[in-house]
Amino acid sequence: MYYNPKYAAAGLSGWAKPEIHDNVGDFFRTGFTQNSTFNISQRKNDVSYSFSISDTYQNGIIPSTGMTRTGARGAVDWKVDDRWKAGFSANYSSVKVKAAPGANSGIINVVYSAPAEYDLKGTPYHAPGKPTSQILFRNTSFNNPYWWAANDEFSQHTNRVFGNAYAEFTPKLNWGDRYHLVFREQAGLDTYTSNNATVAELGSAYN
């Protein structure tokens, strides 16, 4: 048996048997991805169209991380007559990513540097009754990764719309089958908004 003051500060007895803990294996989890898509397309006479909706849900291997993505697409082509064609396509996507911080604010370095004799997962990550007082095997200038997963957030949310429309004119010039003259006018749009957020609760090492 040996005495660890960090265990005592976390509300445990403080005494522990020498054991080896798999802190890396305990922290990471199995990732999960789910994709769903619905599509409808048809061609009737001189008009063809296609519409689709897609959704992706993903859990990352780091707790509280993941991604959600929703998309929609539509396209229409219309042969007005032997000379004129017109059409458009439009796309929309919404992507939200919850990621783990890196560099000096990272939590993965804490996971990999945790001593094998310290039970990172089994030790409460804050003092009893004091959720803003982190418990960690080292100085709390770094976040306990479990405390971070329960309290902080690093996210990016991007909405994007892009597409184009066209009109095409093919005059009849009696040049035979080898030569054709085509006039095409096309305009497009691509716009997006992106919101990045870092949530650092009271007690976070970021504060």
Task: Show the residue positions of the predicted features.
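Hydrophobic, lipid-facing positions within transmembrane beta-strands of outer-membrane proteins
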Residues: 34-38, 70-74, 161-165
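Transmembrane beta-strand segments of outer-membrane beta-barrel domains in Gram-negative
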Residues: 130-159, 186
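Residues embedded in well-ordered regular secondary structure
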Residues: 1-63, 101-104, 148-155, 166-170
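Transmembrane beta-strands of outer-membrane beta-barrel proteins
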Residues: 49-51, 86-88, 181-185
